[in-house]
């Protein structure tokens, strides 16, 4: 219950910009957030490996 309420609270637009919390749009995780993709590192890795994020591919050299 606490996690659900925190996710809903983070999605609301705050009165002041500094009160904004970055949370993953998919799972609600507050840590390891990637701003460019609006998701956490775990969801990013999962979706990138499945090829669901356009322009992102696994690097190899």
UniProtKB/Swiss-Prot annotation:
Q: Which molecular-function annotation in GO is an example for this chain?
A: rRNA binding
Quote a single Gene Ontology cellular component term: cytoplasm
Name the HAMAP family on file.
Answer: Ribosomal_uS14_2_B
Q: What does this protein do?
A: Binds 16S rRNA, required for the assembly of 30S particles and may also be responsible for determining the conformation of the 16S rRNA at the A site.
Keyword entries, A-Z: Metal-binding, Ribonucleoprotein, Ribosomal protein, RNA-binding, rRNA-binding, Zinc
Biological processes per GO annotation: translation
Q: Which PANTHER family does its entry note?
A: 30S RIBOSOMAL PROTEIN S14, SMALL RIBOSOMAL SUBUNIT PROTEIN US14M
Write out the residues that bind Zn(2+): 24, 27, 40, 43
Q: Quick check: keyword Metal-binding in the entry?
A: yes
Q: Cofactor note, please?
A: Binds 1 zinc ion per subunit.
InterPro entries, sorted: Ribosomal_uS14, Ribosomal_uS14_bact, Ribosomal_uS14_CS, Ribosomal_uS14_sf
Does the record carry Ribonucleoprotein as a key word? yes
Q: Which PROSITE patterns match?
A: RIBOSOMAL_S14
Task: List the protein's name.
Answer: Small ribosomal subunit protein uS14
Q: How does it assemble?
A: Part of the 30S ribosomal subunit. Contacts proteins S3 and S10.
Q: Which family does it belong to?
A: Belongs to the universal ribosomal protein uS14 family. Zinc-binding uS14 subfamily.
Necessary cofactors: Zn(2+)
Under the heading Pfam families, the entry gives: Ribosomal_S14 (PF00253)
- GN (gene name): rpsZ
Q: State the organism named in the record.
A: Borreliella afzelii (strain PKo)
């Amino acid at each position: 219950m606490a996690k659900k309420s925190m996710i809903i609270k983070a999605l609301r637009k705050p009165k002041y910009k500094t009160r904004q919390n970055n949370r993953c749009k998919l799972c609600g995780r507050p840590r390891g957030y990637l701003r460019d993709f609006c998701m956490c590192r775990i969801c990013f890795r999962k979706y990138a490996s499945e090829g669901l994020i356009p322009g992102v591919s696994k690097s190899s050299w």
